[in-house]
Amino acid sequence: MREEHVGAVHAAKEKIGEIQAILAGATDAAEEMIGVVVGATGGENCGDPSGRGAFERAARVPDLINDVYATLVETVNELDAYLLGI
């Protein structure tokens, strides 16, 4: 495999790792919001039955999803640039 191919594969693996980390954060935020809703509605106590901070946690999810989208766009653009250079 040519050196530039090795570099491209390495860069792609790094991007995949970034996407996985962002999605893990989005998952954690979503699970936290679900816990607040369950607690606030009389379900099991999920750490914040009062609902305090629910809006702040809910506000994080769109930002995390936007981060995923931006990373995917960046990856696609880099792949396009690489393929055009072959």
Segments predicted by a language model, with ranges:
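N-terminal secretion-targeting helices of virulence/extracellular proteins
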Residues: M1-I86
